[in-house]
């Protein structure tokens, strides 16, 4: 345990004496001395750590203060920018008015007025400086006086509004501009003082490093954190206060398809009495409209293809043909809320998002959501929805699953408008006039040409008669495994096709029992969502489109389904497809707003309809194949003449269009919107109906072949069946997540839906 050559005890003293008297030797530290030295160094490091911590806290406080001033300045800058554009627009309009009035003056006065107008336009810098000096910057004011004035001008602070329409009264604009400039001066003064203080601190540290500076053995000084921050003038901003962090696939989406998952919600189907459209409450009480998404903003997000990789929308000149503008209110919010709503994404096209998005906002824009659903459901902002979890169309501001589904588009919730009596035995009872005795608010309104809204008195046969369903029964649940953004059912009603992420699965629903896919058609990229799939009438070919520039045509007649052709366009995504009645032509709605016409026999691009200024989200074709109806994230529905290749009509709305359907018997067009409303328009008259049962974006819509009823689905997890055209509610089904897509069989016997909880549901329609 001890060295064997240690000298005997009686010799140690003499050895020590000899050592003391001998030549000096190197200092040898004992263990206690070493421990004391380590303790001192530890205490020094601890002190250094403490000083660095205090400095870090100080810097954090300064950062918070600077950010607060930055936000304040941003609000002021935004207000000034809006005011500048507003005044510019006013000047343009006044100039036009002057130009129109001059010809009415006498010849001698015309020249004088023209010269006076020209003189008024010649504003010199001296005049500008004089005006600014008088109105905004009294030279004698000190910084403290400016601060006091700034505080008085900004109590409360300027609201950062999403739309110019919500600015203050013009009379307040000047005060707002003046106070904004004063606030900016205060910000500059504060920044100058702060920089001076930091420079002084840095100089002091250079002279006396003190305990907050580490010194290396070679005499070099280790820079402190504040030294680094002061010298690194090009550092990136650490945080973006208004940005959205899409940290996972489940939260991300191009256009923010927005999907709400609530597995606890049971499936339920309710039938309602036709007499439940009360007339005692003609105006609906709704929650405040959702905040504008960057798209509408886009969902937009985000089923707005919400909201969030935003694909810059291709700004195309609107078709030159005169459009039929809808002059009647488009929604209840038109009557009660000022200005357009905004996605996301785009809503944050979002988004503030993407919109978000979308929101597929959508989120088509929002986002393929919301903020958003489709990509960003339709806010589509754009071609790929990456969420592993539930997303849904609101990225139109479909919100794709990453859509925020949206942002997109975000959630556009509103309070329930109607409470239904589920007893079907009430169907045959009741007069044609909805009785106010029920005390239930109306959900269906007729809008006349002059914009007057009145609750619809349903006829006695609204829910009875040939071809009108009584309810629907859930028949099969098809566990696809990914968010189901597209569904279709074959004419034979034996096979159902469900489109999810990167593939279409084929299901045989002709037999009872647990269902497994009989085939899987891999198309697009593995991480891109299928947005639409359409069967040709003969059932031998399937066309698939989605978050890619290529459409795939599958040969289903071969022993093993295979791709027999691919159609490639310049747009990064396809949101919807339609097939002509003769199956010779395919129409695809693109994320750049164009409608591409494909010759299926020669597999070539025939023409493009240009008019939508944002993604085209939905499409339907008339029964005779002569007219095409399209809806877009630019808040318009357009009708195209397929024989002449031109636009016939245009209807403008205050909300992004996520879905539409044209009645097979003609005359009526149903439009589902991000605002949660459905509008049923007469194609040749100004009359229309507004339906208010959905509580969030209407993501899909499909007419029955008989034309007497149609179904709609939404982000509120609902499947609603409606009577054409006045919208009496036939039945309603509640699913466990956002219902992104639907289809009705050609014999009107089955309904298929695709939802955000990664499954499709087959319903049997009971008559």
Swiss-Prot record:
GO terms for molecular function: transcription corepressor activity. One of its GO terms (biological process) is negative regulation of canonical Wnt signaling pathway. Ubiquitinated by XIAP/BIRC4. Residues 1-26, 200-346 are annotated as: Disordered. WD repeats lie at residues 467-498, 525-555, 569-599, 611-641, 693-723, 734-764. Residues 324-346 have a biased composition (Polar residues). Residues 212-274 are annotated as: CCN domain. It comes from Xenopus laevis (African clawed frog). Residues 200-209, 235-255, 277-289 have a biased composition (Basic and acidic residues). This is Transducin-like enhancer protein 1. Its main location: nucleus. Residues 294-306 have a biased composition (Low complexity). Nuclear effector molecule. Keywords: Nucleus, Repeat, Ubl conjugation, WD repeat. Abundantly expressed in brain, lung, testis and ovary in comparison with liver, heart, kidney and spleen. Ubiquitously expressed in the developing embryo. Present in unfertilized and fertilized eggs. It is found in: Nucleus. InterPro entries: Groucho/TLE_N, Groucho_enhance, WD40/YVTN_repeat-like_dom_sf, WD40_repeat_CS, WD40_repeat_dom_sf, WD40_rpt. GO terms for cellular component: nucleus; transcription regulator complex.
């Amino acid at each position: 345990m001890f060295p064997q050559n240690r000298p005997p005890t009686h010799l140690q003293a003499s050895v020590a004496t000899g050592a003391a008297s001998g030549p000096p030797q190197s200092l040898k530290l004992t263990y206690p001395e070493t421990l004391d030295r380590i303790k001192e160094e530890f205490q020094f490091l601890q002190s250094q750590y403490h000083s660095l911590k205090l400095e870090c806290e100080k810097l954090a406080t300064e950062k918070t203060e600077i950010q607060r001033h930055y936000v304040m300045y941003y609000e002021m800058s935004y207000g000034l920018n809006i005011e500048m554009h507003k005044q510019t627009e006013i000047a343009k309009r006044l100039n036009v008015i002057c130009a129109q009035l001059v010809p009415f003056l006498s010849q001698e006065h015309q020249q004088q007025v023209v010269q006076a107008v020209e003189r008024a336009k010649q504003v010199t810098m001296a005049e500008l400086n004089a005006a600014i000096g008088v109105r905004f910057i009294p030279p004698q004011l000190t910084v403290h006086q400016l601060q006091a004035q700034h505080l008085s001008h900004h109590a409360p602070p300027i609201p950062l509004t999403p739309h110019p329409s919500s600015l203050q009264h013009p009379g307040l604009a000047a005060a707002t501009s003046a106070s904004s400039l004063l606030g900016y001066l205060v910000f500059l003064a504060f920044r100058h003082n702060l920089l001076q203080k930091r420079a002084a601190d840095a100089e002091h540290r250079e002279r006396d490093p003190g305990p907050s500076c580490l010194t290396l053995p070679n005499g070099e000084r280790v820079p402190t954190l504040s030294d680094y921050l002061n010298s690194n003038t090009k550092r990136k901003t650490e945080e973006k206060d208004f940005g959205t962090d899409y940290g996972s696939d489940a939260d991300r989406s191009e256009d923010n398809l927005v999907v709400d998952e609530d597995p606890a919600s049971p499936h339920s189907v309710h039938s309602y009495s036709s007499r439940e459209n009360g007339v005692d409450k003609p105006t609906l009480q709704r929650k405040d409209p959702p905040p504008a998404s960057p798209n509408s903003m886009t969902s937009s997000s985000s089923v707005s293809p919400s909201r969030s990789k935003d694909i810059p929308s291709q700004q195309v000149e609107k078709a030159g043909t005169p459009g039929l503008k809808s002059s009647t209110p488009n929604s209840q919010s038109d009557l009660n809320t000022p200005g357009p709503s905004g996605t996301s994404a785009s809503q944050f096209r979002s988004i503030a998002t993407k919109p978000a998005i979308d929101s597929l906002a959508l989120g088509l824009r929002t986002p393929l959501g919301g903020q958003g659903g489709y990509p960003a459901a339709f806010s589509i902002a754009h071609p790929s929805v990456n969420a592993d979890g539930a997303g849904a169309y609101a990225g139109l501001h479909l919100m794709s699953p990453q859509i925020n589904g949206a942002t997109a588009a975000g959630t556009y919730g509103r309070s329930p408008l109607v409470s239904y009596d589920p007893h079907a035995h009430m169907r045959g009872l009741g007069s044609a006039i909805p009785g106010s005795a029920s005390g239930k608010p109306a959900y269906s309104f007729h809008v006349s040409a002059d914009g007057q809204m009145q609750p619809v008195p349903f006829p006695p046969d609204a829910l009875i008669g040939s071809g009108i369903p009584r309810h629907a029964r859930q028949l099969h649940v098809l566990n696809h495994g990914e968010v189901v953004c597209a569904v279709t059912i074959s004419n034979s009603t034996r096979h159902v096709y469900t489109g999810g992420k990167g593939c279409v699965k084929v299901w045989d629903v002709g037999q009872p029992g647990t269902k497994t896919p009989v085939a899987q058609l891999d198309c697009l990229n593995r991480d891109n969502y299928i947005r639409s799939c359409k069967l040709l009438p003969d059932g031998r070919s399937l066309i698939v489109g989605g978050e890619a520039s290529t459409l795939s045509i599958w040969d289903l007649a071969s022993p093993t389904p295979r791709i027999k052709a691919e159609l490639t366009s310049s747009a990064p995504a396809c949101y919807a497809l339609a097939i002509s009645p003769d199956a010779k032509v395919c129409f695809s709605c693109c994320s750049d707003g164009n409608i591409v016409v494909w010759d299926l026999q020669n597999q070539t691009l025939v023409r493009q309809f240009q008019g939508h200024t944002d993604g085209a989200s939905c499409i339907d074709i008339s029964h005779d194949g002569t007219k095409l109806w399209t809806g877009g994230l630019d808040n318009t529905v357009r009708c195209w003449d397929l024989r002449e290749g031109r636009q016939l009509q245009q209807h403008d709305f205050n909300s992004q269009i996520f879905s539409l359907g044209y009645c097979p018997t003609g005359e009526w067009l149903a439009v589902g919107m991000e605002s949660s409303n459905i509008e049923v328009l007469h194609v040749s008259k100004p009359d229309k109906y507004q339906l208010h049962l959905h509580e969030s974006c209407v993501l899909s819509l499909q007419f029955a072949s008989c034309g007497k009823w149609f179904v709609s689905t939404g982000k509120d997890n609902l499947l609603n069946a409606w009577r054409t055209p006045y919208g009496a509610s036939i039945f309603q089904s509640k699913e466990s997540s956002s219902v992104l897509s639907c289809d009705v069989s050609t014999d009107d016997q089955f309904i298929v839906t695709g939802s955000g909880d990664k499954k499709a549901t087959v319903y049997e329609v009971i008559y």
